[in-house]
Amino acid sequence: MRNSFITLIFLLLLSGCSEEKEKVVEQESSESITPAQASTSDENNNQTTETTTPAVITPAVQEQIEQKPEVKTFKVTFKIDENDMVLGNKDSKIVVVEYFSPTCPHCAYYHSTIFPELKQKYIDTNKIAYVTREFIATKQDLDASILARCKGDINSFMLFHDIILKQQDKWSVSNKYRELLTDIGQLGGVTPEEYKKCLSDDKITETLIANTNFITKAPKFIGTPSFFVNGVQTENYSINSISAAIDKAIEESKNKIDL
């Protein structure tokens, strides 16, 4: 079944994004993905505008297109669900959802330079619930994301999340990326046997596919990293943009209480 999942992941559709005008998106996400090209972010001059680059569909993947996995439907929204990795206050009325790809250079930049300030200001003070979700565009993204979720707890997830992004330039461009990820796994306490088992865990893969399918329907989503504050997408991933959106949501929440 995993081969079919890999096939479907390479056939993600960004060009067919929803033309709906609502900023808050809620839909049912299925593992059945319409054939098309996937997209990831590309470098730009100001480090705050997302662009996309189509993923390559290899001949080996193309040969598997006819294979169909069992269809299971996940309900994905911009609210917290049982499959989410959450930092901060899970009971907060302010939910920030970050979409990233393990192979995305902008995502690595964000996490090394912007996220620490955001964490100190809003997460450590329990002002928000911060959800990190993956956008899967390549096999490398899939395998790295599975490693990060392998143990299933937020501490392990964030540990691998940090290592994977810091060492992105080493494993993501290597033909031996699986071996390198296996080595990274051992650094974080995941044995090669455990990682192999997680790679065959349909539930993890299904969650990643569902999250990916969901975000492609967001009207303004064009790549990673992308951020949504209570379902409303921020202008970019600068600290000023994200902070402004969070502060606005906090103020609106206070006003509702006052009423």
UniProtKB/Swiss-Prot annotation:
Residues 33-42 have a biased composition (Polar residues). This is Putative protein-disulfide oxidoreductase RBE_1288. It comes from Rickettsia bellii (strain RML369-C). It is found in: Periplasm. One of its GO terms (molecular function) is disulfide oxidoreductase activity. Gene3D superfamilies: Glutaredoxin. Its EC number is 1.8.-.-. GO terms for cellular component: periplasmic space. Residues 25-54 are annotated as: Disordered. Residues 47-251 form the Thioredoxin domain. May be required for disulfide bond formation in some proteins. Belongs to the thioredoxin family. DsbA subfamily. Pfam families: Thioredoxin_4 (PF13462). Disulfide bonds join C104-C107. It comes from the Bacteria. Residues 1-20 form the signal peptide. The keyword Nucleotide-binding does not apply. InterPro entries: Thioredoxin-like_fold (IPR012336), Thioredoxin-like_sf (IPR036249), Thioredoxin_CS (IPR017937), Thioredoxin_domain (IPR013766). The keyword Transmembrane helix does not apply. Keywords: Disulfide bond, Oxidoreductase, Periplasm, Redox-active center, Signal. SUPFAM superfamilies: Thioredoxin-like. Residues 43-54 have a biased composition (Low complexity).
